[in-house]
């Protein structure tokens, strides 16, 4: 048998070494997955089960809803005993979430499927500055590394799914935080005075399918590490809209039923992502757009814009860095 040359020996040893490293990595990964699944199993039954929860909003008095009142036009179903809006905070992590308007009344309804061994759903009521605040939290009990490794090969079958129904007819200051998941949010028809949305690490769809009741003073949206779309923003009827984001794209349709004769200030600030706005011609627009290249564009009325002096006036400011911005009319 011919002896191997020096370079051949080096090549042989290198090949054996690479194969050994790959084999060790595969075996190590398999052991890590098995250990992660064992860790989760020690917490209890990891099979998702149906869960339903009804959470009362303190400080409200329930009334029978008035069937003659159209959603988004007047308050019905419940009112606060303190005379001011209720403060409701939803903090949702790691799942697929649907937030929508519920029946008139004084209760937040939560339903969905998840393993109570792996996730926890809690509620808490505090008094802050003389106002009552109810906080609903959904989060994981298990370590992040264990959930990630144990989910290898399982698809989305065990992913938590939760639907939260917010009662109509109750004046609410709403704070909604969704992270490490996906959400479909419809807040149309609710009675909102202030709204704060913090959406991170996932794709999120926000809609106002019906006008909110009363008049919202301020709508704040913060988006990070994900894509966010907003539909029918005019139905929010907010006097001030402040949107900021990073590492993702924001798409907003400014259609909807803005109040006749109203004026609104809208600000969109984005870094490492795009901002795309669609504005109907039935509203008056004053746009100040600045992109990452320092290009500045001021837009006023165009040929198709309404000439009605009582049409809603939107003052829009857009600023992007490391991304593009676009404002289109329809």
Regions found by a protein language model. Give the residues of each.
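Short, surface-exposed interaction patches in beta-rich subdomains
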Residues: 67, 103, 109-114, 119-122, ...
């Amino acid at each position: 048998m011919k002896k191997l040359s020096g370079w051949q020996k080096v090549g042989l040893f290198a090949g054996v070494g690479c194969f050994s490293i790959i084999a060790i990595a595969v075996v190590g990964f398999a052991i890590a997955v098995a250990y992660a699944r064992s860790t989760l199993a020690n917490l209890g039954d990891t099979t998702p089960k149906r869960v339903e929860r009804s959470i009362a909003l303190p400080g409200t008095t329930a009334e029978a809803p008035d069937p003659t009142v159209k959603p988004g036009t007047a308050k019905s179903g419940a009112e606060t005993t303190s005379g001011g809006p209720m403060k409701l905070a939803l903090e949702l992590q790691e799942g697929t979430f649907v937030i929508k308007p519920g029946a008139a009344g004084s209760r937040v309804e939560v339903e969905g499927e998840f393993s109570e061994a792996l996730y926890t759903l809690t509620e808490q009521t505090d008094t802050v500055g003389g106002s009552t605040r109810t906080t609903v939290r959904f989060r994981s009990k298990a370590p992040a590394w264990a959930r990630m490794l144990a989910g290898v090969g399982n698809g989305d079958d065990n992913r938590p799914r939760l639907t939260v129904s917010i009662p109509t007819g109750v004046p609410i200051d709403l704070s909604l935080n969704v992270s490490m998941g996906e959400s479909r949010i419809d807040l149309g028809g609710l009675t909102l005075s202030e709204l704060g949305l913090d959406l991170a690490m996932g794709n999120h769809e926000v809609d106002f399918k019906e006008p909110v009741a009363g008049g919202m003073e301020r709508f704040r949206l913060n988006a990070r590490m994900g894509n966010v779309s907003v539909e029918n923003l005019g139905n929010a009827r907010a006097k001030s809209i402040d949107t900021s984001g990073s590492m993702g794209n924001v798409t907003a349709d400014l259609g909807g039923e803005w109040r006749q004769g109203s004026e609104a200030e809208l600000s969109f600030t984005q870094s490492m992502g795009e901002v795309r706005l669609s504005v109907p011609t039935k509203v008056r627009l004053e746009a100040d757009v600045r992109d990452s290249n320092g290009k500045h564009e001021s837009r006023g009325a165009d040929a198709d814009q309404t000439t009605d002096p009582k049409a809603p006036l939107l003052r829009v400011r857009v600023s992007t860095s490391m991304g593009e911005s676009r404002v289109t009319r329809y």
